[in-house]
Structure formats: C-alpha cells, structure tokens
Amino acid sequence: MIGRLHGKIIEKQPPEMVIDVQGVGYEVLLPMTSFYSLPQIGEEATIFTHLVVREDAHLLFGFAQKQDRTLFRELIKTNGVGPKLALAILSAMSVSQFANAVEHEELAKLTKIPGIGRKTAERLLVELKGKFKGVAQSDFFEEHSVETIVATHSHDPADEARDALVALGYKLADAEKMIKKVNKAGATSEQLIREALKASL
C-alpha cells in the first residue's frame, strides 16, 4: 500500500496530477478540495494516498490532509459508493461540511452531488450517522487553510474546469451550464471549479 508521496509536481490537470518521486511519475486523482491547496508545477508537495486495485487498473487517490483520506475510506465502505463517487463527494464539500450534512440529515444537500440519488444518500446517513459526534472538537475534522490558488498551464480555464467537472461525474451539459454561470475574465480553472461546486450546493 502506498500511503504517502512526497515529490515535485510535474503536471496538473484537474482532478488529476502527476508527482515525480525520485524519477518515478505517479498519476494521482484528487478531490477538488485537495487540488485547491496544491503548490505550483515544479514545486514540491506531500500528499496522503489510497491505492485502489482493480482487475483492469491500479488507481492512486491523493489527499492534502489525512482526515480527507480517512473520510474517503469510510465512504468506500458504504454499499453503492465506489472510489469515483467518494471523490465527487469530497470535491463537493469539505470533511466538516459532509459531517454536518450527515449529522443533521440534510438529504437534499447530498443528492445535489452527481451520482448520489435518494437511496444512496439515505444509505450514507444510516451507515455514517453517529461517526461524526463532536466534530468541532476533533482534530480529525480540523479545518486547514488552503494556499493561494495558482493557475495551471491551460489554454482555456473554462474548458479545463468543464472537463474536470465531467471527470467528477457531472453530465457535459450540466458542467457547461455550471461553468458559464461563474465564468469571469482572469479566473483560473481551479477558481471556476471551486465557484461552480459551491454554487451547486
């Protein structure tokens, strides 16, 4: 199991990055909440990882904080929630936001995330409720400030942001509408993704 990587970021294409660790480039999928805190291409970063082994692929998921990875692992234990859906959940809301949604049984908030229907949302509430007691006092859910968002090398931030939303499970037409609503001159793809996800909840 690969639990942690430290190296130089050589590619960033939301929601994927490539990190060079002593000459080996690891492709890593990250939730957008972690992607926002990545430093610039060429700089060093440390990410916590979870390896998913399938018949057709080995997928490496990365997280800026340990508590993000812990929630990811709890999510994929839930019946009907695979790694890609867990990634979409963590892209749409922070760990503490998700914990609050579960503890307060905010079904509507959960069903706004692509791939989560009413049944899956109800299952999440049943299986995870009670696991987040005292989240405000817990270091596990401590909010961490994120570094300033930096531009990825892209020709069109709006197209890149749209593609990232599609990769997270949104339909192309919905992704285009979401980006169109928040698009503004000078915005980076990461800023557009963040604003689009925030507006969708």
From Swiss-Prot:
<protein>
    <recommendedName>
        <fullName>Holliday junction branch migration complex subunit RuvA</fullName>
    </recommendedName>
</protein>
<dbReference type="Pfam" id="PF07499">
    <property type="entry name" value="RuvA_C"/>
</dbReference>
<dbReference type="InterPro" id="IPR003583">
    <property type="entry name" value="Hlx-hairpin-Hlx_DNA-bd_motif"/>
</dbReference>
<feature type="region of interest" description="Domain I">
    <location>
        <begin position="1"/>
        <end position="64"/>
    </location>
</feature>
<dbReference type="Pfam" id="PF14520">
    <property type="entry name" value="HHH_5"/>
</dbReference>
<dbReference type="GO" id="GO:0006310">
    <property type="term" value="P:DNA recombination"/>
</dbReference>
<comment type="subunit">
    <text>Homotetramer. Forms an RuvA(8)-RuvB(12)-Holliday junction (HJ) complex. HJ DNA is sandwiched between 2 RuvA tetramers; dsDNA enters through RuvA and exits via RuvB. An RuvB hexamer assembles on each DNA strand where it exits the tetramer. Each RuvB hexamer is contacted by two RuvA subunits (via domain III) on 2 adjacent RuvB subunits; this complex drives branch migration. In the full resolvosome a probable DNA-RuvA(4)-RuvB(12)-RuvC(2) complex forms which resolves the HJ.</text>
</comment>
<dbReference type="InterPro" id="IPR011114">
    <property type="entry name" value="RuvA_C"/>
</dbReference>
<keyword id="KW-0238">DNA-binding</keyword>
<feature type="region of interest" description="Flexible linker">
    <location>
        <begin position="144"/>
        <end position="154"/>
    </location>
</feature>
<comment type="similarity">
    <text>Belongs to the RuvA family.</text>
</comment>
<dbReference type="GO" id="GO:0009378">
    <property type="term" value="F:four-way junction helicase activity"/>
</dbReference>
<dbReference type="InterPro" id="IPR013849">
    <property type="entry name" value="DNA_helicase_Holl-junc_RuvA_I"/>
</dbReference>
<dbReference type="InterPro" id="IPR010994">
    <property type="entry name" value="RuvA_2-like"/>
</dbReference>
<feature type="region of interest" description="Domain III">
    <location>
        <begin position="154"/>
        <end position="201"/>
    </location>
</feature>
<dbReference type="GO" id="GO:0005524">
    <property type="term" value="F:ATP binding"/>
</dbReference>
<keyword id="KW-0233">DNA recombination</keyword>
<feature type="region of interest" description="Domain II">
    <location>
        <begin position="65"/>
        <end position="143"/>
    </location>
</feature>
<dbReference type="InterPro" id="IPR000085">
    <property type="entry name" value="RuvA"/>
</dbReference>
<keyword id="KW-0234">DNA repair</keyword>
<dbReference type="InterPro" id="IPR036267">
    <property type="entry name" value="RuvA_C_sf"/>
</dbReference>
<dbReference type="GO" id="GO:0000400">
    <property type="term" value="F:four-way junction DNA binding"/>
</dbReference>
<dbReference type="GO" id="GO:0005737">
    <property type="term" value="C:cytoplasm"/>
</dbReference>
<dbReference type="Pfam" id="PF01330">
    <property type="entry name" value="RuvA_N"/>
</dbReference>
<keyword id="KW-0227">DNA damage</keyword>
<comment type="function">
    <text>The RuvA-RuvB-RuvC complex processes Holliday junction (HJ) DNA during genetic recombination and DNA repair, while the RuvA-RuvB complex plays an important role in the rescue of blocked DNA replication forks via replication fork reversal (RFR). RuvA specifically binds to HJ cruciform DNA, conferring on it an open structure. The RuvB hexamer acts as an ATP-dependent pump, pulling dsDNA into and through the RuvAB complex. HJ branch migration allows RuvC to scan DNA until it finds its consensus sequence, where it cleaves and resolves the cruciform DNA.</text>
</comment>
<dbReference type="GO" id="GO:0009379">
    <property type="term" value="C:Holliday junction helicase complex"/>
</dbReference>
<dbReference type="GO" id="GO:0006281">
    <property type="term" value="P:DNA repair"/>
</dbReference>
<dbReference type="InterPro" id="IPR012340">
    <property type="entry name" value="NA-bd_OB-fold"/>
</dbReference>
<dbReference type="GO" id="GO:0048476">
    <property type="term" value="C:Holliday junction resolvase complex"/>
</dbReference>
<keyword id="KW-0963">Cytoplasm</keyword>
